C-alpha cells in the first residue's frame, strides 16, 4: 500500500505526485515506484469535496473543470509514514498514512451541508481500469474490485501488458447516510488509454452519467 496525492491521470506520472502541478485530483492507494514508461497503478482514488457534485476530476491545466482542487504548498507536511495538506478549493485538511496492509485517510471538513467523499474506481495512471465492482456491506463499509488490462492503457500505454486486479475493503468512520454510484456508457469501439481517457468526448460521457441511488451494488 502506498497512499499518495495524485496530480494527473494522463501522461507519465507513476509516482502519482508531481511538484510542478498546482492541483490534486485525489489520493490513491497504489503507486508504481522506480519505473517510467507512462506509469500505472494509482488505483482507488479518494477525494473529499464540498458543494455541487462534480463527476470528473477535470484537467490539470484547468481547461476542463472538475472536482480536483488547488492546494496550499505551505501547509504540506511530508515525512516517513505521514502526509498532510490543505485543499484550498474546499478548505479541507487531508491527512494520510499507511500500514503494511492498509491505507488511512482522515479528512477535516469545514461546516457544510454538502460534504462528501468521492471514490473513482475507474481511475488509473496512464489509462483506466476496464471493469469495476462495488458492494455496500453496511452503513460503514464497502468492498469490491477493479480489473486493469492492457486495453485500459497503463504501463507503456498498454504495451507493457500490465494485467492485474485490485481488491479493496473500505471502512468509514461516519455512516453512509446518502450515497450513489455512476457508471458511464463508453462505446465498445472507443480506445480507453492514456490520452483518450482525458479527451473531451470521454470526459463528457463520464460527466453526463446518471447517479444511481438506493442500490447496494
Residue ranges with predicted function:
Residues 1-217:
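Accessory carbohydrate-recognition regions in carbohydrate-active enzymes
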Amino acid at each position: 500500500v502506498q497512499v499518495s496525492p495524485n496530480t494527473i491521470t494522463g501522461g507519465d506520472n507513476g509516482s502519482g505526485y508531481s511538484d510542478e502541478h498546482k492541483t490534486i485530483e485525489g489520493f490513491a492507494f497504489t503507486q508504481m515506484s522506480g519505473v517510467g514508461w507512462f506509469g500505472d497503478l494509482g488505483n482507488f482514488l479518494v477525494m473529499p469535496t464540498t458543494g455541487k457534485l462534480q463527476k470528473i476530476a477535470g484537467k490539470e491545466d484547468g481547461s476542463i473543470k472538475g472536482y480536483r482542487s488547488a492546494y496550499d504548498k505551505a501547509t504540506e507536511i511530508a515525512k516517513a509514514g505521514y502526509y498532510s495538506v490543505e485543499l484550498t478549493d474546499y478548505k479541507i485538511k487531508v491527512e494520510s498514512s499507511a500500514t503494511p496492509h492498509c491505507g488511512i485517510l482522515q479528512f477535516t471538513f469545514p461546516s457544510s451541508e454538502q460534504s462528501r467523499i468521492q471514490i473513482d474506481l475507474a481511475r488509473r495512471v496512464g489509462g483506466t481500469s476496464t471493469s469495476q465492482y462495488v458492494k455496500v456491506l453496511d452503513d460503514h463499509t464497502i468492498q469490491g474490485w477493479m480489473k486493469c488490462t492492457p486495453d485500459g492503457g497503463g504501463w507503456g500505454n498498454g504495451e507493457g501488458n500490465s494485467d492485474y486486479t485490485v481488491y479493496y475493503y473500505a471502512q468509514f468512520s461516519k455512516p453512509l447516510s446518502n450515497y450513489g454510484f455512476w457508471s458511464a456508457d463508453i462505446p465498445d469501439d472507443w480506445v480507453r488509454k492514456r490520452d483518450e481517457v482525458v479527451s473531451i468526448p470521454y470526459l463528457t460521457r463520464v460527466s453526463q452519467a446518471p447517479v444511481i441511488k438506493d442500490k447496494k451494488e
